[in-house]
């Protein structure tokens, strides 16, 4: 039997990469042959974490069915966010912390989803449930994932379970979570060498919202104006993405990791739904979103509801 591949979503973030690696370690300790792989290039933040704990970057795959018939999804479940030939393989497990949408299987599946801030928090619990030890590098990667998804425990998605898991993982990894976390986030916020196209795909996800197709990209920075200075260039790339991919709306969330606020750059036919969702008026295609840092909890739910209500 070919080994089972474990991967997160396209345009991978730190949780997607690190949780795939961690879950592959857990399954290996249980005697199951798996391999963590990735569906895109890791960002600077993720590379910082991998280097800090001496772990190799998983290999890149474009398709899965040419080498296995069984896959495990972490940090996502929506098909449009997954490997391109997801319909040609059997999803045997899902470990996730997002909404469930556009997902079905022909066979029974082990599905573990919890309303926590990070997939790694769930995997930490699975190690405990199976009575397994967490290796130091794996603990460091799972800590990195929690710090990333919670913006160093400041995001509204962060739960007490996430904080407790991070505390225990930091002890195993032998690091100070606050100090290490800030350095990691700053590494990810250094986007000076990124093209407009790279900024818009570093952390982008497609969503089916009713009959509408929406893409929401997000980038972390320490100065929003540095990103907005490139607005004209960004809008050209966004317009091309809308036309090429048949999108109804593209939302680019630029998040200040120091102030915990965001600015959204919004284009497409459904901009009225965005304005309704956030009770705002777009000015030059942008809107300030005070206190908004989480795509999952603060952007997707109100936008999904608004699109359903706006013609």
Swiss-Prot record:
The gene is ppaC. Its main location: cytoplasm. GO terms for cellular component: cytoplasm. Its cofactor is Mn(2+). Belongs to the PPase class C family. This is Probable manganese-dependent inorganic pyrophosphatase. The keyword Mitochondrion does not apply. InterPro entries: DDH_dom (IPR001667), DHH_sf (IPR038763), DHHA2 (IPR004097), DHHA2_dom_sf (IPR038222), Mn-dep_inorganic_PyrPase (IPR022934). Mn(2+) 2 binds at residues 15, 75, 97, 149. Pfam families: DHH, DHHA2. The keyword Glycoprotein does not apply. It catalyses: diphosphate + H2O = 2 phosphate + H(+). The lineage of its organism: Bacteria, Bacillati, Bacillota, Bacilli, Bacillales. Transmembrane segments: none annotated. Binds 2 manganese ions per subunit. Mn(2+) 1 binds at residues 9, 13, 75. Its EC number is 3.6.1.1. PANTHER family: BNIP - RELATED, MANGANESE-DEPENDENT INORGANIC PYROPHOSPHATASE-RELATED.
């Amino acid at each position: 039997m070919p080994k089972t591949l474990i991967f997160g979503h396209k345009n991978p973030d730190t949780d997607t990469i690190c949780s795939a690696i961690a879950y592959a370690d857990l399954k290996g300790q249980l005697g199951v042959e798996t391999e963590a792989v990735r569906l895109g290039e890791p960002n600077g933040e993720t590379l910082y974490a991998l280097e800090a704990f001496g772990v190799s970057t998983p290999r890149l795959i474009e398709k899965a069915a040419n080498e296995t018939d069984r896959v495990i999804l972490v940090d996502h479940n929506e098909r449009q966010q997954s490997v391109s030939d997801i319909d040609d393989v059997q999803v045997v497990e899902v470990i996730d912390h997002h909404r469930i949408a556009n997902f079905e299987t022909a066979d029974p599946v082990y599905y573990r989803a919890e309303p926590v801030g990070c997939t790694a928090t769930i995997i930490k619990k699975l190690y405990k449930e199976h009575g397994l030890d967490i290796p130091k590098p794996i603990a460091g990667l799972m800590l990195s994932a929690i710090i990333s998804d919670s913006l160093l425990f400041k995001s509204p998605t962060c739960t007490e379970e996430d904080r407790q898991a991070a505390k225990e993982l930091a002890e195993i990894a032998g690091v100070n979570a606050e100090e290490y976390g800030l350095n990691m986030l700053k590494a990810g916020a250094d986007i000076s060498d990124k093209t407009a196209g790279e900024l818009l795909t570093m952390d982008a996800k497609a969503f089916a919202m009713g009959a509408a197709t929406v893409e929401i990209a997000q980038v972390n920075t320490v100065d929003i104006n540095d990103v907005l200075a490139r607005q004209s260039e960004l809008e050209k790339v966004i317009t091309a993405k809308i036309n090429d991919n048949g999108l109804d709306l593209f939302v680019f969330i630029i998040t200040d990791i120091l102030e915990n606020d965001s600015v959204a750059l919004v284009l497409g036919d459904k901009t009225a739904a965005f304005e309704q969702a956030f009770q705002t008026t777009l000015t030059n295609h942008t809107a300030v979103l005070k206190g908004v840092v989480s795509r999952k909890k603060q952007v997707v739910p109100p936008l999904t509801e608004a699109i359903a209500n706006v013609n």
